């Protein structure tokens, strides 16, 4: 196709795509493709009219009850969560019973967030396996144990394997009978159908699967409890920083802690010339012995319900679940529980608390009365909302696609108990298209969420603060904790930086708005 404009790029002049697609020849090309290939292109005025209507109260009343379609949900699929959970155990190779394309997606999703490669294999199911079952794929696939030399293989499933009803337990036993792997080699499994639930359900299923494998084969559940405390982080995009912070805090208290699924090393390997297919992770022996711990703490109640129920039946008598404890109060509650269990309060932690309170006092005038929309996983939304209220801010719209009716009531109770947040409302089983209606009809100052919120930011012109998984378009946030007093300080700084950037952007026109373009904030 000919163009009326000369081509802007040549071998001697390579233009970055940011600039290239703004050149006249590309503008002309895009316009022509729209005219030729879009069936009956809608007039610009009609597009503008409908767009304006979708921002109204009338449209919101039609949009919020919609359940038959989901547009931009705040969740991913079960296998992603299961894969993350599996990679938190020593020398573990996730084995996805399904197609290669699916496992490529799961690996890519995690890699784009953590900026680290992650190892997983597939049983490479194709059309014949979909008809006759995937037993032979499982038998052949588990033989990769000899090539990759893991200490454990954790099996999860895709939609294909679940639709045809493959029996993982039976398949694994058959594979062991065929000597694909030694009979005593650990191969825990979890059924993780991607067409129901979410990544947090998949995480829960895999944690339960691993514990069932080790604890279900323990010889003596009546062994006296030891002084160890188990901790389950839950699905957490900041797991690298948060798990290390939890271990640091445990060290300050002198607590012997077993983190059940510790991905902090596996997703933060150094570039030192040594390739590590498996790095760090919870030792398998410690996982087996965790059944004898004095207590188990879950950092995310809504991310670990089945695991907690299993622990109630089989494991440590003491159980405590939190909702992504952030901020002063959230950290207070966690550390008081640790002090109670260990009998060892730490002065160092008290000093950290005082520094956080001082920082909040220094900056509270910039936070007081600011209105926020928060979306993400159920526990994150709860923890984040509580911290915002501590800062004097107002969480207005709290939304989670994975949120249940129970979660809605819990969030609403928290909001109603705070005068500054009493106008806030929780929305479970809703998506970002619903949130779009909410923020257009009931304005907020900032949105807290993940990278998918950037399209909402562009549409609504409301600044986005990225504080939860996945963060694809920013680098290395996951290395910094959001839990503990130090983590709360990191979150506070992240929020304040966005507020100050917004102030500068709105006061930088010389002679018009720069009267408040201040050097000191």
From Swiss-Prot:
One of its GO terms (molecular function) is nitrogenase activity. The keyword Metal-binding applies. It catalyses: N2 + 8 reduced [2Fe-2S]-[ferredoxin] + 16 ATP + 16 H2O = H2 + 8 oxidized [2Fe-2S]-[ferredoxin] + 2 NH4(+) + 16 ADP + 16 phosphate + 6 H(+). CDD domains: Nitrogenase_MoFe_beta (cd01974). Keywords: ATP-binding, Iron, Iron-sulfur, Metal-binding, Nitrogen fixation, Nucleotide-binding, Oxidoreductase. [8Fe-7S] cluster binds at residues 77, 102, 159. Its cofactor is [8Fe-7S] cluster. The keyword Lipoprotein does not apply. Disulfide bonds: none annotated. One of its GO terms (cellular component) is molybdenum-iron nitrogenase complex. Binds 1 [8Fe-7S] cluster per heterodimer. GO terms for biological process: nitrogen fixation. Its EC number is 1.18.6.1. InterPro entries: ChlB/BchB/BchZ, Nase/OxRdtase_comp1, Nase_comp1_CS, Nase_Mo-Fe_CF_bsu, Nase_Mo-Fe_CF_bsu_N. Ala-194 is present instead of the usual Ser that would serve as a ligand for the 8Fe-7S cluster in the oxidized state. Belongs to the NifD/NifK/NifE/NifN family. This molybdenum-iron protein is part of the nitrogenase complex that catalyzes the key enzymatic reactions in nitrogen fixation. Tetramer of two alpha and two beta chains. Forms complex with the iron protein (nitrogenase component 2). This is Nitrogenase molybdenum-iron protein beta chain. It comes from Azospirillum brasilense. The gene is nifK.
């Amino acid at each position: 196709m000919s163009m009326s404009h000369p081509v802007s790029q040549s071998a001697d002049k390579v233009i970055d795509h940011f600039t290239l697609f703004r050149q006249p020849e590309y503008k002309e090309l895009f316009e022509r493709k729209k005219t030729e290939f879009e069936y009956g292109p809608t007039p610009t005025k009609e597009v503008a009219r409908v767009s304006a209507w979708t921002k109204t109260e009338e449209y919101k009343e039609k949009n919020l009850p919609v359940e038959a379609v989901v547009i931009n949900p705040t969740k991913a699929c079960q296998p992603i969560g299961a894969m993350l959970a599996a990679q938190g155990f020593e020398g573990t190779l996730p084995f996805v019973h399904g197609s290669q394309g699916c496992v490529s997606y799961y690996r890519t999703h995690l890699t784009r967030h953590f900026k680290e490669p992650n190892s997983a294999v597939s049983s490479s199911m194709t059309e014949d396996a979909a008809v006759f079952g995937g037993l032979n794929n499982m038998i052949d696939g588990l033989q990769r144990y000899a090539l990759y030399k893991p200490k454990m293989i954790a099996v999860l499933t895709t939609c294909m394997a679940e639709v045809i009803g493959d029996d993982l337990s039976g398949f694994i036993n058959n594979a062991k009978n065929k000597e694909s792997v030694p009979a005593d080699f650990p191969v825990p499994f979890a059924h993780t159908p991607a067409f129901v639930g979410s990544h947090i359900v998949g995480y829960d299923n895999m944690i339960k699967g691993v514990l069932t494998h080790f604890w279900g084969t323990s010889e003596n559940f009546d062994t006296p409890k030891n002084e160890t405390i188990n901790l389950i982080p839950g699905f957490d995009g900041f797991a690298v920083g948060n798990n290390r912070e939890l271990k640091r805090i445990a060290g300050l208290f002198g607590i012997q802690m077993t983190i059940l699924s510790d991905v902090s090393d596996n997703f933060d390997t150094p570039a030192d010339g040594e390739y590590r297919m498996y790095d760090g992770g919870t030792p398998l022996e410690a996982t087996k012995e965790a059944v004898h711990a004095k207590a188990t703490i879950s950092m995310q109640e809504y991310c670990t319900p089945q695991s907690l129920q299993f622990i109630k039946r089989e494991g440590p008598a003491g159980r405590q679940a939190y909702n992504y404890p952030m901020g002063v109060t959230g950290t207070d509650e966690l550390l008081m529980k640790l002090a109670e269990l260990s009998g060892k309060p730490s002065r160092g932690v008290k000093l950290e608390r005082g520094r956080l309170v001082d920082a909040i006092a220094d900056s509270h005038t910039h936070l007081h009365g600011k209105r926020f929309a928060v979306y993400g996983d159920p526990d994150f939304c709860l923890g984040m909302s509580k911290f915002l209220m501590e800062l004097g801010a107002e969480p207005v719209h709290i939304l989670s696609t994975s949120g249940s009716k129970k979660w809605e009531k819990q969030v609403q109770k928290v909001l109603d108990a705070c005068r500054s947040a009493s106008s806030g409302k929780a929305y479970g089983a809703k998506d970002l298209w619903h949130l779009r209606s909410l923020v257009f009809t009931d304005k907020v100052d900032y949105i807290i969420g993940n990278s998918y919120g950037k399209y909402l930011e562009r549409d609504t012109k409301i600044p986005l603060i990225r504080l939860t998984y996945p963060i694809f378009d920013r680098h290395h946030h996951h290395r910094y904790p959001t839990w503990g007093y130090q983590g709360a300080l990191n979150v506070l700084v992240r929020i304040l930086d966005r507020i100050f950037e917004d102030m500068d952007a709105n006061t930088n026109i010389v002679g018009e708005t720069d009267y408040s373009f201040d050097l000191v904030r």
